[in-house]
């Protein structure tokens, strides 16, 4: 909210979003339960990214190249001028709604696994598949992988990963098994 309070660019972005939800209110006031819904989180995150990009550009910092992972692809396309602000926000609102519909009725979980080799995590995942769908969903960087799928299988895979030497297993606040074969 401090960007909104202090920079006209932020006011322009948030005040001109035309969506079926009040993005500004959700970002600044919540409630967290509503903001955490994928259909709401995604347009809010892209709106903040649009503001950040515009502020950087206003201060002479423009990207030579852009890239994004998952939701970040839309922010990258906006930063590159491929998608205008409203189109990017509309697309991710639709994307979030579609993801929620696809995940409805699936008891799912995602957990970040820290400090374990990919091959060892693959072993844990394969063993846990006896309980349901689980897979490595994100390769964030060496030593930081995310598993996702059906809750029971993901929990088991994380327990096995810890037994195999993972330093930590961090449950993620997600509303679906993103980047898995379930979604």
Question: What do the predicted segments below correspond to?
Answer:
Residues 5-8, 75, 140:
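Compositionally biased, intrinsically disordered low-complexity regions enriched in proline and serine
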Residues 19-24, 30, 80-183:
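Alpha/beta catalytic cores of group-transfer enzymes, especially the acyltransferase/condensing modules
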Residues 1-67, 147:
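Helix-rich "cap/lid" substructures immediately adjacent to catalytic or cofactor-binding pockets
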Residues 42-112:
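Gly/Ser-rich oxyanion-binding loop with an adjacent helix/lid
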């Amino acid at each position: 909210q401090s960007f909104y309070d202090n920079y006209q660019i932020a006011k322009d972005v948030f005040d001109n979003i035309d969506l079926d939800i009040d993005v500004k209110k959700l970002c600044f006031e919540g409630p967290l339960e509503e903001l955490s819904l994928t259909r709401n989180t995604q347009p809010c995150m892209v709106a903040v990214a649009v503001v950040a990009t515009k502020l950087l550009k206003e201060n002479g910092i423009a990207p030579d190249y852009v890239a994004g992972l998952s939701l970040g692809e839309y922010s990258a396309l906006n930063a590159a001028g491929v998608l205008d602000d409203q189109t990017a926000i509309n697309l991710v609102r639709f994307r979030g709604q579609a993801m929620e519909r696809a995940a409805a009725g699936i008891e799912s979980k995602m957990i970040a696994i820290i400090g374990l080799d990919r091959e060892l995590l693959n072993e844990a995942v394969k063993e846990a598949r006896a309980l349901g769908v689980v897979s490595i969903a994100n390769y964030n960087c060496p030593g930081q992988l995310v598993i996702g799928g059906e809750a029971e299988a993901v929990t088991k895979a994380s327990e096995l990963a810890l037994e195999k030497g993972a330093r930590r297993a961090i449950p993620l606040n997600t509303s679906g098994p993103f980047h898995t074969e379930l979604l």
